Regions:
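Glycine-rich beta-strand-centered segment in the early N-terminal region that forms part
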Residues: 19-36, 46-86
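Short glycine-/small-residue-rich Rossmann-like dinucleotide-binding loops
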Residues: 36, 68, 196-197, 217-218
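Local beta-strand N-terminus motif with an aromatic residue
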Residues: 77, 89, 188-190
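NAD(P)H dinucleotide-binding glycine-rich loop of Rossmann-like/cofactor-binding domains
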Residues: 79-141
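Residue-level detector of alpha-helix initiation sites
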Residues: 115, 144-149
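Adenosine-nucleotide cofactor-binding segment
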Residues: 134-143, 151-202
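Glycine-rich phosphate-binding loop and adjacent beta-alpha segment
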Residues: 199-259, 298-300
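C-terminal hydrophobic helical "lid"/dimerization subdomain
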Residues: 247-300
Length: 300
């Protein structure tokens, strides 16, 4: 089956065609309806990070068009949110645990970025529960989309007192309220989510004994004085969608959107038509004008 897709050539996405194979018995075929344009994909054009082939276009919503013989959780015509790296294809194949059934076909259910946010906790669940019982301080470095999901889930799902949470950044004041700080409050923190990639927790004495450091953004190489970490028994974790807990996070993402615990609408600024406006989704996403968050591409 010949299928259109986007391919990065000389750090610009170009439209081309490939031969999509038929599904295996543990796969479904999906017709694309919405795809979020992620920061990772924009880095193809920025040329800020090396990009592996076939590793983009993974924030998707679509309609099931074929079902493998061993698939029992969805049927043809169902709507799904997927995490498959499908190259912005018109149709693509999706493996078990790379999709979840969703109640309606809407960009609200572009779940992959929400699942990535939840996975910061899910992948570290046992350690998180242990430290959260102590009711110590929690630091979130960054105030964008991921931080918003984290803060909402911490306060609404895990009943964390907002007074225990310190968010460093300058965005989404209406979400963080008094928890938002422009500069780093110097305390000893039990749990730190580093979403900025500045290596701040490794170059400042802010980690408590037996603390948990979750690194959610890659930083530049930095010389670190290990005396800051010595004898503190710090657990450092690098969450990833490749972790076996990610499917759990994907299901949780569907639940918190469906129950309106978290509302993603304000973060999707604009949709662009696949056939006539797709280049604008990338060019505007790169330039990121004021009050612009994220764009997505709409298939007919």
């Amino acid at each position: 089956m010949k299928v259109r897709y986007f391919h990065p050539i000389n750090n610009v996405f170009e439209e081309t065609v490939w031969d999509k194979p038929d599904i295996k018995n543990t796969e479904i075929e999906v017709k694309t309806k919405y795809v979020g344009v992620s920061n990772n994909d924009l880095n193809v054009i920025y040329n800020q990070t090396p990009y592996a082939s076939n590793k983009y276009g993974c924030e998707s919503v679509g309609i099931v068009t074929k079902v493998g013989s061993k698939i029992t959780d969805v049927k043809v015509g169902d709507f799904v949110a997927t995490t498959t790296n499908h190259l912005y294809s018109d149709f693509y194949n999706c493996k078990t645990e790379e999709y979840v059934k969703i109640p309606k076909c809407s960009p609200r259910y572009i779940l992959e970025p929400i699942a990535r946010s939840l996975n910061l906790i899910t992948q570290n669940w046992n350690k998180f529960v242990e430290l959260n019982r102590n009711e110590g301080k929690i630091l979130i470095l960054g105030s964008g989309f991921v931080a918003s999901v984290l803060y909402t889930v911490l306060t609404k799902e895990h009943d964390v007192d907002p007074n225990r949470i310190y968010v460093v950044g300058s965005h989404n004041k209406s979400i963080f309220n008094k928890s938002l700080y422009n500069t780093l409050p110097i305390h000893l923190y039990d749990i730190v989510f580093d979403l900025q990639g500045l290596n701040t927790p490794l170059t400042n004495n802010i980690l408590n004994t037996n603390s948990l450091l979750i690194i959610g953004a890659a930083g530049k190489p930095t010389l670190i004085d290990l005396n800051l970490l010595a004898h503190k028994s710090v657990t450092i974790n690098f969450p990833s969608p490749d972790n076996n807990k990610f499917y759990e996070s994907l299901n949780d993402a569907c639940r918190i959107v469906e129950t309106k615990i978290f509302d993603p609408n304000k973060f999707w600024t604009k949709g662009y038509k696949r056939d006539t406006e797709w280049k604008s989704a990338f060019s505007i996403g790169i330039n990121r004008p004021k009050h612009y968050n994220y764009g997505y591409i709409i298939w007919n």
